Amino acid sequence: MRKLYCVLLLSAFEFTYMINFGRGQNYWEHPYQKSGVYHPINEHREHPKEYEYPLHQEHTYQQEDSGEDENTLQHAYPIDHEGAEPAPQEQNLFSSIEIVERSNYMGNPWTEYMAKYDIEEVHGSGIRVDLGEDAEVAGTQYRLPSGKCPVFGKGIIIENSNTTFLKPVATGNQDLKDGGFAFPPTNPLISPMTLNGMRDFYKNNEYVKNLDELTLCSRHAGNMNPDNDKNSNYKYPAVYDYNDKKCHILYIAAQENNGPRYCNKDQSKRNSMFCFRPAKDKLFENYTYLSKNVVDNWEEVCPRKNLENAKFGLWVDGNCEDIPHVNEFSANDLFECNKLVFELSASDQPKQYEQHLTDYEKIKEGFKNKNASMIKSAFLPTGAFKADRYKSHGKGYNWGNYNRETQKCEIFNVKPTCLINNSSYIATTALSHPIEVEHNFPCSLYKDEIKKEIERESKRIKLNDNDDEGNKKIIAPRIFISDDKDSLKCPCDPEMVSNSTCRFFVCKCVERRAEVTSNNEVVVKEEYKDEYADIPEHKPTYDNMKIIIASSAAVAVLATILMVYLYKRKGNAEKYDKMDQPQHYGKSTSRNDEMLDPEASFWGEEKRASHTTPVLMEKPYY
């Protein structure tokens, strides 16, 4: 058996070697598969080093070879379709012994930096109203908040009321409008709980005790088992108050309820449904709205501070350009602009309502008669979980640029891919804090990326090895802006960018191969579309690499199976001896026993409900 194992293993490795290295296959053949398909290039991604193009194949252009005039230089020089267009040398802005070629790869140096502003990806749910997930409790489906990022400055306004939403819900004989959204008092107190109280409560929990205050608050709220259902995935949302460092668990997950059929703004009718809506208000500056899914590394992957001296833009072949189509509103300051962006941001609020939904008087009658079927739709239209279970998945007008000079707020729904350095602007998002600002613009980003790309290419073409004439070859990336104009390797004199706090220079004499359309889409220009037909994949050996990876994985699996088989045969006796010791098997590693489990009787004989929270809306009577 062991001989068979060795034979199979050697055969497998031989097979893998032939796929990867054998039969003289050249993996860099045909890097551009030309076609007539027109591809957008919004999604530029940096390729791993092993997938990058050899940007220097056949042609070399030295200084003495350039004899064209200025008008010819932008279009008429030969283009190496293997990946490089030579940069003209008349201006002699770099060493005469250097041969500079321009890469054809339109990479984006902002990719990593801007990842946290891809809100659809990093948050994945509504912002203004977050009801992006469903969970079952006692056989019934309910909607609940699910955003992965904190929403800074978000709170709930109860219309025509002085009651704050962080006040506990009405209980016992209290009128509905006497209560808010938070959990009622408990013994021991679980909400609100101070940061120090949570630290002490979870001091022996390795999974929770070292979390930051926002994530800790989210996990604390998530430890509550609704309706005594330990198998439910439903988790309550929470609000953390930075001012007093308290975590408030929200008993009501609904965030908006408007319209005469669903609520009553008349304060004199104390026991009628109150109207409410989400907002970023001055009163909520220190609040942060949290779902059960807030990631523990949110500080790295989610936006918090607004960006001073910055304007969101789109990366277009070597430079960051303005977003052409925006919605412009007046705003006196950054707070008002951030508030406007929030109001227009992604929302999971239902868009259609059931025709047969009863008005609030009938819902009130349901409270009076303790008829759960009449009141289960309270606090949001029934359509939210029957006729219309809308989920935005984070798509919306989530970004804005605030112009401090004109006091205009420019709001848009296209994912920004770079930042423009402009002293008049502040870039903001619907998730960001209403007033907190990051002051440090990454001025060295372009220079650092240019250096990194040149070094990366030099390793491939052995830049340090001089040719016969003592010349060096440099493959310059398609980055035409930098705070170091010498790093641009520009064939003309770079121009200084106005309103730039970084003193950026831009090279304008190299032909740009992409443009922005009127609908905010970045596309390759018509004359270059054949060369970039593979965009956004843009990996010449992508299909081959998939085959190689799959075959290598298959070989590894085969080898593992054989090794496990031999090991099992050798250790059969010991295995069965161990199986006689039940204490080694089936030991749970879960921490359900550590989760808070409030008794159902805590809420009284009747409980509250809505389609966003699994507990009935009937007021608890103590």
Curated annotation (Swiss-Prot):
Q: What's a GO cellular component annotated to this UniProt protein?
A: membrane
Q: How does it sit in the membrane?
A: Single-pass type I membrane protein
State where the protein is found. Membrane
Asked if the Swiss-Prot or TrEMBL record annotates the protein with the keyword Signal, the reply is yes
Which cysteines does the record link by disulfide bonds?
C149-C302, C217-C247, C263-C275, C320-C418, C337-C409, C443-C502, C490-C507, C492-C509
Q: Which residues cross the membrane?
A: 547-567
Residues with an annotated glycan are: N162, N286, N371, N421, N422, N499
- Enumerate the Extracellular topological stretches: 25-546
Q: Which residues lie on this side of the membrane: Cytoplasmic?
A: 568-622
Q: Which UniProt keywords are given for this protein, alphabetically ordered?
A: Disulfide bond, Glycoprotein, Malaria, Membrane, Signal, Transmembrane, Transmembrane helix
Segments carrying the region annotation (Disordered) are 578-603
* InterPro entries named in the record: Apmem_Ag1 (IPR003298), Apmem_Ag1_dom_sf (IPR024056)
Q: Is NADP included in the keywords of this UniProt record?
A: no
Q: Do you know which SMART domains this protein is assigned to?
A: AMA-1
SUPFAM superfamilies hit by this protein: Apical membrane antigen 1
Q: Which residues form the signal peptide?
A: 1-24
Similarity comment = Belongs to the apicomplexan parasites AMA1 family.
Biological role stated in the UniProt entry: Involved in parasite invasion of erythrocytes.
Protein name, as recorded: Apical membrane antigen 1
> What species is given as this protein's source?
Plasmodium falciparum (isolate FCR-3 / Gambia)
